[in-house]
Each structure stands twice: as C-alpha cells, then as structure tokens.
Amino acid sequence: MFLNFSLQNNRQELLLLKTAIEKHGISVDLLKYDESFVVKSVRHRMDETICKALDEYFELIAKSLDETNRFIESLQISYSEFFRNPLTFSVLEKIILPTLIQKRKNETSELRIWSSACAKGQEPYSLAIIMEEILRLRHEKPKYRIFATDQSQVQINAAQLGEYSSGELNNLTLDRVSHFFDTLGNNHFIKAELKRNIDFSVFDLFDKKFSSPPSSIFGGFDIVFCANLLFYYKNAERKKIIEKVGNSLVDNGFLVTGETEREILVTHGFKEVYAHSGIFVKR
C-alpha cells in the first residue's frame, strides 16, 4: 500500500501521481520531499475527498484541477506559531538582538533579518515585536528590516493581512496583544506600525536564479530563520537550502532552525551558540 510505502519500492506510485498532476500543465517535484510528508499529505486529501483507494485518488487528481491545487497546497509548509520556540526567542531577545543593535548604534546600516518560510507571518511578526520592544526601551528609532518570504502566494497574502484568531495568540501576553493588535470580536489584526519594517514576498528556496529574496537586493543578513522546514525534505534538498541561506549570512551571522532540526545543522558545518537554542553560526 502507498500509505505505508518505502520510496524505493513505491517510486512508481509517486511518478503516477506526478503524471496525474501534470495533466493540468502543472509541474511538481514530489521526490524532493521526505516520503513520510508526502504520505501524510496524500492520506489527508484522500480522507477529505472520501477516496478509498490510491488509484481512485489519482483519477480524481487527473480530472480535477481544484483537487490538484488543494493537494499541491497541502505540500506547502503552512503551520506556524507566534514565538514558537520560547528558548530561541528568549536568547534572541535577551542576548543576540541587543548586542547587534548596540553594534549598530553609531552606524547608518540597518539590521537585516530573513524569515525564509514565514507561512502566515507569525515568525516575522514575533521578531518585529521583540525589535520594537527593545528599541522602545533604548529610546531609539527603528533601524531594521525583516524580509519575510514563502513559496506560497496564499500564505504571503495571509501574512500581509495579519489577521489571527484568539487561539492563534496563545503564546502572546495580554500586554503584547493590546499593544500590537487591533481586536474585533475573536479576531485580531496586526497594527500598521508593526508591519512598516517587514517586506513580504513570494520566494522559492530552490530557485536557482536567486541566492536570496530579490527584494533584499544582495542578501547580507545578520539573522536567517530557517526553522521547522528542513525535516520536510530529503537530505540532498536540505543541503541546498542550508547552503543558500548560509551563503546569505554576513560574517558571524546567525542561522536559526527548529528544535528538532538542530542535528541537521551540526552535520552541515554549523555550531550552536547556546545549548538547545537552535541558533547557529558557521564553524
């Protein structure tokens, strides 16, 4: 059964799925994803469409552009949270960001941060909240730019809107909610002043034409977030992503990954600056 497949034995099933998708003139590389992630996506869509067998679902994909788009969208990494890894954000807030800001006190250049898979925007907005709070305490004007990218236009649209339910704000204090959000019923909207230093754009980390988001012009990031993304891909693709984001860092820049992805960075020439923080620098 495909739903318990080993890629070596079920490559044919993946190729059949790819062929069904391509009937709509859409190309997608299913082989770059970790097989368990593809299985999970297929299983979810089969449940949603009440397909009992794999060939039945493939037939639906071949006939329905809507379902094809839904399946492809299910491959987009869309889950995120505000302040998702508390230890990571605590180290950034208490140590790394204040240090970087102090170094730039007498400089005209801005602090540059890249959120490389921003989903609905929780990650870049979390960073902006910290930056605004630090600068407010220091009585300094904002001098930073956050480049927030995602390969999904749907996710970027949602991030730019900045609308969240009460349940999505669980990791935020009431003070932060009242200061940075406008509330209407159970919906909360990011205030315009928090968006002013964030640049949202669609960007594919596998795009060979660009080494960093075109909107950033030249890369040169002090911090790059590549968190909770790598484990969705196979080793070869992980290496490509790490090389791209690593090359976009300034000297002694920081690469931030998810809690479960720390060992991946260690095996690719990075060292963790604080234990279990998920914050790395190049060796």
Model-predicted regions and their roles:
Residues 2-114, 258:
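Conserved AdoMet
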Residues 108-121, 145-147:
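Conserved class I S-adenosyl-L-methionine
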Residues 116, 137-138, 142-225, 229-237, ...:
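Extended basic-aromatic, gly/pro-enriched interface segments that bind polyanionic ligands
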Residues 120-138:
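Conserved SAM-binding loop of SAM-dependent methyltransferases across substrates and taxa
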Residues 239-251:
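A short glycine-rich, Lys/Arg-flanked "PGG" loop and its adjoining helix->strand segment in the class I
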Residues 251-259:
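Conserved beta-strand signature within the Rossmann-like core of class I S-adenosyl-L-methionine
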